Amino acid sequence: EGVMNFMNTGDIRKLPNIDTSFSAVALDINEIDVDSLSFPFCTECMVIGEDIPRDKLSQTIKPLGDSIVIAGSKHRAKVHIHTDDPATLFETLATYGEVQQQKVDDMREQNKSVRSQQKIALVVDSTCDLPVDLLEKHHIHVVPVRLNFGKEQYIDRVTISNEEFYTKLAHSAHHPQTSQPPPADFRRMYQFLSSHYESVISLHLPQVLSGTYQNASAALEKVKFKQHQTILDSLSVSAGTGVIALELAEAIDQDMSFPELTQLAEETIEKTEIFIALKTLDAVQKGGRLSVGKKRLIDFLGLNLVLSITRNGLLKPCGVTFGRKNIFEKFKKFVLKKAHNKSIKRIGIVHGVNPDTAETMKVVFESAYPDAQVFVSDFCPALGVHAGVGAIGIALQYN
């Protein structure tokens, strides 16, 4: 049942004490027009190598941004820069050594928080699949998951796009691995939000699938909001977490109280289901979640597993369809049967570079449930590691 564990855990190695202090003066985003910045991403990392030429390194990255500060030693250099392309920056720095402790903050998003009139912040991790326009519209704050191909480290949806991820998934010699955001990432997010919001709700992957919930909880214990703060287990993944987040975000927009929000969250989680169909089991097998023998047997029998989240937060098969032809047509009928005679408020459809199938599903479900809000999004890279190319997920939120 290795396929049931969605996320791997990981720890950042402790670094020896070195002088990595920056003399630069931080920008006050309250006093500048952040939207007009040419280089909106405040980016930091550690470069570990042999005899790192810091002056040359500085000149190399100069065209990529401004506010450059490099500190440390010849073997460990900490880099700070404001850039518009963190991915290219990290790729460039990798020519000087191993890039670790990547950190990227979007100053435009921080500025929106400063200007927001809301009193309650909503935080999710990047496994919550929602279209970017909905995340921005409802001021939903995202802490990204980490992933790596061998020694190449990436920040989910920040330093690797979906297109880049799936290209690497198909061609890299290394099958990617994921790790939950470290507590420091959550703590930095919470500390910033505590200066601009009275309360926070942080919604994450099931505790039994990932250490994300635990890391978020550990970080929040060290930050104090003026009114209320809580971590919620979504008991869902991907678009399932997405529809729950949307319900809470709309309630926050309507100034619902914190106790009412937590009650609403419990009810919404109970009313949410997600179903996932994999085009192939290749990613599952390569990731060590399914033995070669079991994969061969499933393929030989022509079985298509349909996965879902149990009430305990476990990802398990909830059914099968038969025959390798028209997999997603059969999956569509499976989900429609599950939803038969039920009143549906929201439907989230996600895909792993399978947009045509996702759009076809959208048309079908909009026709079947004309009163429901329907959205389409990509499977984030952190989940694409396990779902693989072509996967389709459908989340249903019942009234």
Where are the regions that the model predicts?
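A generic structural motif
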Residues: 75-84
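Mixed-charge interfacial surface used for oligomerization/domain docking
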Residues: 1-76, 110, 114-117, 127, ...
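Short amphipathic alpha-helices in soluble, non-transmembrane regions
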Residues: 56-63, 89-97
